[in-house]
């Protein structure tokens, strides 16, 4: 699977050490990620690793092991919420950069209510912060939304209608506010804004609609689950 990602048409790839990895497999996942980063030909892709969250027993070792890799471009911090944590992580990346001329970039996954509330301060928390991602799945859980699919509003959530011709309803209206908050913070601090994935990846129409909406809002990119959609 990692080899397919390296040879895909994607502009960027992130290797996951967090949600996709069971607790008992964390160490092996880190070793696999390091091997792939150093061994595979990634071309001109941006290569990122999603590390575990602040407070995890795994994050310190992950950061120390990844910080000096020459072919790695960034780490993605999930559940970013507090300025002090982001600032400290940025300093750790700089301290452990080894022979790199510059420290790794730090990308932030905004996926909780507190993260959205603090997003402006998080965007400015450290000079290494380069991008803000919207984590729609965990955000839904954070606010108590009854969503069945990542990236879709709950079935019971709908507008009653409006007379205005320019009123547009989409399945993602529930997420318009956090998406805009994240986008505004990214633009204010000259960062990239990346939308989260559309969970029902076999639904090509839904995936396209989700990507088009994010692009229309001004987002710079979108996470995808399947390489089939790299052309979007």
What are these regions (language model features)?
Residues 1-232:
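Expand to "…catalyze enediolate/carbanion chemistry for C-C bond making/breaking, isomerization
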């Amino acid at each position: 699977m990692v080899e397919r990602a390296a040879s895909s048409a994607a502009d960027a790839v992130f290797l996951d050490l967090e949600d996709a990895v069971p607790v008992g497999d964390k160490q092996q996942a880190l070793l696999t990620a390091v091997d792939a980063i150093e061994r595979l030909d990634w071309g001109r892709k941006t290569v990122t690793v999603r590390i575990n969250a602040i407070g995890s027993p795994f994050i310190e070792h992950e950061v120390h092991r990844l910080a000096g890799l020459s072919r790695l471009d960034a780490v993605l911090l999930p559940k970013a919420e507090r300025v002090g944590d982001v600032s400290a992580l940025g300093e750790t990346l700089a301290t452990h950069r080894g022979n790199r001329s510059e420290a790794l970039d730090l990308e932030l996954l905004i996926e909780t209510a507190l993260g959205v509330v603090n997003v402006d301060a998080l965007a400015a928390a450290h000079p290494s912060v380069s991008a803000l991602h919207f984590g729609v799945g965990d955000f839904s859980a954070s606010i108590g939304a009854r969503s069945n699919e990542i990236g879709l509003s709950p079935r019971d959530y709908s507008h009653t209608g409006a007379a205005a011709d320019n009123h547009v309803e989409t399945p993602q209206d529930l997420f318009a506010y956090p998406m805009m908050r994240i986008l505004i913070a990214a633009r204010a601090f000259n960062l990239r804004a990346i939308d989260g994935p559309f969970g029902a990846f076999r639904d090509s129409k839904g995936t396209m609609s989700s990507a088009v909406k994010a692009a229309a809002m001004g987002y710079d990119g979108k996470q995808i689950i399947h390489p089939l959609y790299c052309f979007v």
